[in-house]
């Protein structure tokens, strides 16, 4: 009798855009199911996630929506999370890509996320493109990316 080692189950691969990331980081409405969905998953994104998250945290702090302590805590989390995510660099190849949604015309930074997710998906299937932005969800769907069933 031979015993074959069981193949380890494949980790879910989730592409997280900035809207979903900030929702979790700032504990906005709907953050709990998003956070639960990311548990144990391989988290993918663009390096733009870090830039956009930090910029939004500065904006919120300047508007008084975050205390200095909250700002510092959030910035520290972004720095730690940068080491948890697999991040796609913004390269000339990504900029030259012809990948565009069929109908939707996304903003430039949204397009960076879409092209990055598409690149990851081409390398190895992603299980879900996670976003809080309805237009971004629709654009991802147009590109054939698996999307959340509904914006959470």
Task: Map each language-model feature to its residues.
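Short, well-structured N-terminal submotif of metal-dependent ribonuclease cores
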Residues: 1-50, 60-72
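Acidic, PIN/NYN-like endoribonuclease modules and their adjacent C-terminal/linker elements
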Residues: 1-13, 46, 119-152
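Residues that scaffold the ATP/ADP-binding catalytic core of kinase and kinase-like folds
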Residues: 23-25, 56, 139-140
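Short alpha-helical
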Residues: 29, 51-52, 135-138
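Alpha-helix C-cap/termination motif
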Residues: 37-40, 81, 123
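Active-site-proximal, substrate-binding regions of enzyme catalytic domains
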Residues: 48-102, 120
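Active-site neighborhoods of divalent-metal-dependent phosphate/nucleic-acid chemistry enzymes
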Residues: 84-135, 145
């Amino acid at each position: 009798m031979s015993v074959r080692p069981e193949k380890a189950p494949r980790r879910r691969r989730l592409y997280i855009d900035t809207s979903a990331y900030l929702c979790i980081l700032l504990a906005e409405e709907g953050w709990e199911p998003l956070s639960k969905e990311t548990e144990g998953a391989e988290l993918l994104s663009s390096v733009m996630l870090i830039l956009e998250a930090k910029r939004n945290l500065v904006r919120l702090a300047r508007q008084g929506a975050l205390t200095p302590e909250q700002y510092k805590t959030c910035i520290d989390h972004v720095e730690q999370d940068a080491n948890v995510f697999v991040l796609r660099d913004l390269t000339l190849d990504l900029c030259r890509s012809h990948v565009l949604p069929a109908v939707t015309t996304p903003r430039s930074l949204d397009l960076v996320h879409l092209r990055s997710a598409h690149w990851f998906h081409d390398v190895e299937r992603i299980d879900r493109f996670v976003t809080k932005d309805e237009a971004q969800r629709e654009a991802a769907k147009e590109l054939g990316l698996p999307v959340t069933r509904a914006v959470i």
